[in-house]
């Protein structure tokens, strides 16, 4: 029984080390580097797919605030699938859209709409959230 337990522990340890090395290598992949560089280089970044209704909704929120996000349309890139995988490893979600403001992850479409409706998005961007108030 002790021998079986020792073998099980060794197998578990090997599996854990393998998993950690896979995650580490993915987190430092060219695609992960692209994601990180893009996020740090632009005030507003949306990782999107051109046909996605949730992505369109998130982009429309920024139009309402007269803001122009930097949009990465994953379906229009040869490396889009790999970028989406790297994005999922970085933020814990593979779904699109994924929105970043000032280098920080805001979330997806619902998170973006909620932040807009609460006024938090306007605060993060340093803009007025009420167009009528600007008149």
Curated annotation (Swiss-Prot):
CDD domains associated with the record: GRX_GRXh_1_2_like
Residue ranges annotated for the Glutaredoxin domain, each copy included: 32-132
GO cellular component, one term: endoplasmic reticulum
Keywords: Cytoplasm, Disulfide bond, Electron transport, Redox-active center, Transport
Matches recorded under PROSITE patterns: GLUTAREDOXIN_1, GLUTAREDOXIN_2
Location in the cell: Cytoplasm
Keyword flag DNA repair: no
Keyword Lipid metabolism found: no
Disulfide partners: 52-55
Its biological purpose: Has a glutathione-disulfide oxidoreductase activity in the presence of NADPH and glutathione reductase. Reduces low molecular weight disulfides and proteins.
Family classification: Belongs to the glutaredoxin family. CPYC subfamily.
Classification via NCBIfam families: GRX_euk
Protein name: Glutaredoxin-C4
Taxonomy of the source species: Eukaryota, Viridiplantae, Streptophyta, Embryophyta, Tracheophyta
Gene: GRXC4
